Amino acid sequence: MDKTKALDAALTQIERAFGKGSIMRLGKSGAALEVETISTGSLGLDIALGIGGLPRGRVVEIFGPESSGKTTLALHTVAEAQKKGGVCAFIDAEHALDPLYARKLGVNLDDLLISQPDAGEQALEIADTLVRSGAIDVLVVDSVAALVPRAELEGEMGDSQPGMQARLMSQALRKLTASISRSNCMVIFINQIRMKIGVMYGSPETTTGGNALKFYASVRLDIRRIGAIKERDEVVGNQTRVKVVKNKLAPPFKQVEFDIMYGEGISKAGELIDLGVKAGVVDKSGSWFSHDSQRIGQGRENVKGFLKGHPDVAGRIEAAIRQNAGLIAERILGSSEDSEDGEDAAEA
């Protein structure tokens, strides 16, 4: 009996036992080989991810220190999904979502499903039910650290419950992964940072909830606040750096910087200036900026104001940047060469 007949017999047996479509040849499956994506709301980050945004049907982890922009980035992704007609859900385990801020970022609150569960099991059960429905495009869990196991809630303050949250996350992700892929729903887990005690070499930082999420996530984003943006003496925003520490769909370790303005979110105009200058679309001479031989302003903040008031110019600059996305990724968003790369690679 030759191999072809043996294989056909095995395939027939598998389909009889588990149903048609349980096994197929990848090229003939009819499934799109290109992964569908949803924009992050940041042009630079979309380019750095290598596929034009965050992937659908996958697990994504966004982690970083406090007040670094984790929830802001997740809400921008929700807003972008809603613009395309997607249905989004937000599981607010921290009980800290600000609806007014979400609206300012472009989130349609009337269509956003929100849950504020009491226990971690309840939160993940709700997530599982929503994903299995097949009707959700983006599901955000904010945050993993706030998913408290019921046994810990019912216990006394100060009781030691080692590893319970890690076991909860591990079991939940085992159940969720297949459903997420089938329903083509993107699940974004927001996570916090903790310090490991007694680490002599490498980074002492780690994320909460054990190691399961590091393995199951297709994309992991490390977001950090690297400076303040001031107008005279008043702080009006943060300079933010995002590093792609894990990416199963494109080369990882790209990093990008952008501005997060208070009450506004990611500054698109600021990104257009920075990416435009580095890509050669916007010319900078001293403090003057010009595009297509036309001066558009003196000083970065003035140019941001000009682009907000002239969406046609901003649109042309964005189109030119997107057209050269491949070159830009190589030229300006090169792999970072920080000493922690080895640590990140090991954790990823």
UniProtKB/Swiss-Prot annotation:
InterPro entries: AAA+_ATPase (IPR003593), DNA_recomb/repair_RecA (IPR013765), DNA_recomb/repair_RecA_CS (IPR020584), P-loop_NTPase (IPR027417), RecA-like_C (IPR049261), RecA-like_N (IPR049428), RecA_ATP-bd (IPR020588), RecA_C_sf (IPR023400). ATP binds at G64, P65, E66, S67, S68, G69, K70, T71. It is found in: Cytoplasm. Pfam families: RecA, RecA_C. The keyword Cytoplasm applies. Gene3D superfamilies: P-loop containing nucleotide triphosphate hydrolases. GO terms for cellular component: cytosol. One of its GO terms (molecular function) is ATP hydrolysis activity. Can catalyze the hydrolysis of ATP in the presence of single-stranded DNA, the ATP-dependent uptake of single-stranded DNA by duplex DNA, and the ATP-dependent hybridization of homologous single-stranded DNAs. It interacts with LexA causing its activation and leading to its autocatalytic cleavage. HAMAP family: RecA. Belongs to the RecA family. This is Protein RecA. It comes from Blastochloris viridis. The lineage of its organism: Bacteria, Pseudomonadati, Pseudomonadota, Alphaproteobacteria, Hyphomicrobiales.
